[in-house]
Amino acid sequence: MNRENKQQQVAELHEKLKRAKAVFLADFRGMSVEQATTLRNELRAAAVEYKVAKNTLLELASKETDKESLSPHYAGPTAIAFSYDDPVAAAKVLSKFAKTQANTFKLKAAVLSGKQISVSDIQALADLPSREVLLAKLLGTINAPVANFVGVLAAVPGSFVRALNAIKIQKEGN
């Protein structure tokens, strides 16, 4: 690879590192082409970009970004996954794959919102419900007091109408 190609790759990686909400590093030593293709397809479905890059290029590209703390992990074969939207989805796919392919694929570290997280933190992130489920729970929590208040307001006239109806039935019976 000539110098111009390397500079272009560094610039491209730098832009992706700056844009990504979360970046995950993994060691893919011993992975077969079939396994790599499966992982790429699963990550693509989760809107995650997956690349294999030279460690020296990653080192240069991560300078002056909030992902610079990953530098000590640029050793051995390094794959990098960029999540631009939902870091939880990326963590789920990568953690699941790391469990099923424990001999050939190991997570190294990640950066989420500018803070480095460990492999155990990645697993904890993967155990979270999806963004949609969390939003639904939040909306349910916000909506519950309003729904209860409406129920209380509707109960007062309802009980009054039932009381009047009971009086009417009682008078008709006499």
UniProtKB/Swiss-Prot annotation:
Keywords: Ribonucleoprotein, Ribosomal protein, RNA-binding, rRNA-binding. Disulfide bonds: none annotated. The keyword rRNA-binding applies. One of its GO terms (molecular function) is large ribosomal subunit rRNA binding. GO terms for biological process: translation. GO terms for cellular component: large ribosomal subunit. InterPro entries: Ribosomal_uL10, Ribosomal_uL10-like_sf, Ribosomal_uL10_bac, Ribosomal_uL10_bac_type, Ribosomal_uL10_CS_bac. Belongs to the universal ribosomal protein uL10 family. HAMAP family: Ribosomal_uL10. Forms part of the ribosomal stalk, playing a central role in the interaction of the ribosome with GTP-bound translation factors. Part of the ribosomal stalk of the 50S ribosomal subunit. The N-terminus interacts with L11 and the large rRNA to form the base of the stalk. The C-terminus forms an elongated spine to which L12 dimers bind in a sequential fashion forming a multimeric L10(L12)X complex. This is Large ribosomal subunit protein uL10. The lineage of its organism: Bacteria, Pseudomonadati, Thermodesulfobacteriota, Desulfuromonadia, Geobacterales.
